[in-house]
Amino acid sequence: MFELIPYTRFRDTPSVRFFDVTIADSNARDLVIHRGPAVSPPDAEESGAWQFYLHPHQDDNLLAASGGRTFYLVNLAWAQPFHIVRLESGGDILNIPRGTFHRSLSDPDGSVVLNQAMRNPNACLDREFRVYNSLKIPRLYQAT
């Protein structure tokens, strides 16, 4: 199941706050910048069907550094397979476990998200970022 992970404020100075946003066991960092109301991955060109990423060898730990994003999560092994999760700048870190279909929509002004991923040794970026068309996976399409 996905999880919202709080982080700790460890220091304040005039007009400045410091936070420890460390994710234990993270071994990869991705900075993902959306300009405007981007959808990732984009809808299928031919049909307009929703498309998703699914990482077989990676857990995502997403922190909105600027703006906000709405995540659509589907995991067919969960009792409730479909969830919509809002990620806001200054909010919790969203953990998306491996094997979860996910896509996101940024706010109108865009967003910047830091992913402190946990990749296992079998991870290959080409395979981890494969796009899945929901129309071609009946159970995924029905869940959304």
Regions found by a protein language model. Give the residues of each.
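Histidine-centered metal-chelating micro-motifs
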Residues: 91-104
